[in-house]
Amino acid sequence: MRQLKREVKIGNVTIGGKNPIAVQTMLNVPVEDIEGNVAQAKRCEAAGCQILRVTCPSPADAKCIEAVKNAVNIPIVADIHFDYKAALACADVGVDKIRINPGNIGDDDRVKAVVDACQQKNIPIRIGVNGGSLEKHILAKYGAPTPEAMVESALYHVRLLEKFDFNNIVISIKNSNVPRMMEAYRQLSAVTDYPLHVGVTEAGTYQMGLLKSGMGIGGMLLEGIGDTIRVSLAAEPEKEVEAGYNILRAVGFPVAGPEVITCPTCGRTQYPCTQIANEVEKRLQGCKKSIKVAVMGCVVNGPGEAREADIGIAGGKGEAVLFIHGKPVKKLTGDNILDQFMDEIYKL
């Protein structure tokens, strides 16, 4: 059962409540390269990104935020550290959300300046707690970035904003240790109704990042925790978007587009099952039809293992049985089984 949080509107996307889980990513082009950021932002939008974060180290870099904002039709989040004037500059150019830790931008007057700017334009603030950068007094208390330490840090920042009657807040509480990250989110979700941005930070190289994010983000979603997600990978941000949707699909959330399933193959396999599955997935990129497609290695277990698929094939030597909703329909034969199969998919 999903844990329902208060709704927060980020540009044209609303998270929290019963709204769909929003998939985010972050640009990784140097902020000085405005053309490169704009081009990458357009690719992310085409990949299905719903909320896009861009770093803004200084007030002058708000021009990159503005350029990206004008180039795409998805909400833009400014990632701010230390320089509160950068947050003010981003508010001036119409950013849709600001990610900040109020405790690292200076005294109360600076926090209030950011809060006032955001309140005037209805810009939400994400408090982004990271296990690698907790406040010294909290680390001294707990000795390590424990779940309790991260939750205390998050609530400390929340109170800084609430002190100025600001509650248009999203919270994230990330760690590179998956069990620690999951326990932190559990504890935080139990004590706040602000929507939660879920992710595993510093997840590692691409493959390990996929595994850790799948376990951490997917695990939280299965427990009903999370309103928006970002899969952090050492890869192009478009890959993060793809991974985010795959995690949502894997844990049972409705996601537009096809899902291709295939068996791992074994000694019974007599046709290029894996190659065909990969090619089917490639050809279906960009398809918005929500169908499950199965490419199975043999007729022994294939139809039964994929009975929940909308359409599939189970191959043999020089042929494949086409089945729809688990029931055999006809045989595909010859050298162009893949093309025949694709024709049948497009008929659905």
Segments the model singles out, each with a brief description of its role:
Residues 1-26, 119, 282:
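N-terminal amphipathic alpha-helix/helix-capping segment at the start of soluble metabolic enzymes
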Residues 18-36, 55-57, 74-82, 138-151, ...:
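Active-site mouth loops of central-metabolism enzymes
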Residues 21-27, 52-54, 76-80, 98-100, ...:
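Hydrophobic faces of well-ordered beta-strands that scaffold small-molecule active sites
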Residues 34, 45-69, 99-107, 169-178:
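Glycine-rich, proline-tolerant flexible connector loops at the mouths of alpha/beta enzymes
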Residues 59-80, 113-125, 185-196, 280-282:
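Alpha-helix-loop-beta-strand connector modules within alpha/beta enzyme cores
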Residues 71-74, 92-98, 119-122, 189-195, ...:
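Glycine-enriched alpha-helix->loop->beta-strand junction motifs that scaffold or abut catalytic
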Residues 85-126:
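Hydrophobic or amphipathic alpha-helical targeting/insertion segments
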Residues 130-133, 138-285:
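Catalytic alpha/beta core domains of metabolic enzymes, predominantly
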